Amino acid sequence: MEAYLKKLCFEYQVDEKEVKELLARMEMVYLDKGETIASATMSEQSLYIIVSGILHTYTTSEGEDKTIRFLSEGDAVLCYNSSQYAVKALTKCAAYYISEEEIEELCASSISFANLVRQLMEYQ
């Protein structure tokens, strides 16, 4: 867990204390291989921080999938405006999850959380 936290803090240039506080408010979810967490047909907006496994972010144009990026341990993905892309698990995954409503509540209650979420969004 310590190595994972250090990677997350380094990758997104955030304080370890803030990340620990955010993770404490998030729910651990488990995704099956092939499970989609964002697509044009899904309206939910949420944030996932990957603990294990690999996610594939891609667009579909003229029936062909075009890779945007692959995500793995320590990466974060903010699922919003999903009409432009989809996110699917390539392997079984474990991830921390928080809904848009909970993100908004946290950001309204704390400047630190608002800055943390802003920094995570900048790396999308």
Specify the residue positions occupied by each region the protein language model found.
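Conserved short histidine dyad/triad with adjacent acidic residue
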Residues: 13, 27-42, 60-63, 71-72
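Short solvent-exposed loop/turn micro-motifs enriched in small/polar/acidic residues
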Residues: 22, 40-42, 79-80
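Short coil/loop residues immediately preceding or within conserved phosphate-binding loops
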Residues: 26, 44, 82
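Glycine- and acidic-residue-biased ligand/ion/polar-headgroup-sensing regions
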Residues: 34, 44-57, 74
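Cyclic-nucleotide recognition modules
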Residues: 62-123
